[in-house]
Amino acid sequence: MRKDFDRYGLIEVCIGEVLRQLKDWISLYKVSSRTLGKHSNEKQKIVSENRILTPDEMRGLLKLYPGQFSNTFIDQAIERGDICVGAFVKGRLAAFLFCSLSTAPDKRGLWVRVKKPYRYGYKSYTNPEYRGLRIRLAYVSDTFFLDREFTHAVSYIERHNLASLKRQHRRGQHTSVGYVIVITLFGQTFFHHTPGVKKIGFELYQHETEDQVLPT
């Protein structure tokens, strides 16, 4: 705990701990945006070929990564028009990133809705042997979306996830948009989006079914 105080500050740690204890009833999410094409100056430590996966290649992920996806997840991602960007090293898939231009599933039965010109990345994975080599598909994929007239990436982080918030702040490319508050009481879930979040068309909501929810 003392290390956390030194790293994040007393107030931040206390806020984070309170929210962590209350997460079954109330969650606070910080929403941020990044201008596409504006990213970290860190260079990849390995050369990769980055391209959009075809629908057949997306279905092929089921065999490459057993247990990561369901057939429904992949089929409905394709149906929605989601884009999966892959990084290939010497012809082998090293990492991938799923991005939505409309709606996307998240954990705990929540879904995300975005509107053009914003895109939302919701599922990524890097093979263990390529981790630490700075294959940052969230950045190198920007050109694919700029070509489609999307100008910003939007993301959200739980307010008690101090490590992720600090990492995002350190990189310096993200602008705070606002917050989403999710309250669950007596089996009912209520959402409050601050004005900045509403302005960009970002929305968290609860889907009527959970068959696409991301694996934990």
Residue spans of the language-model regions?
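Charge-rich, low-complexity intrinsically disordered segments
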Residues: 179, 187-188, 194-216
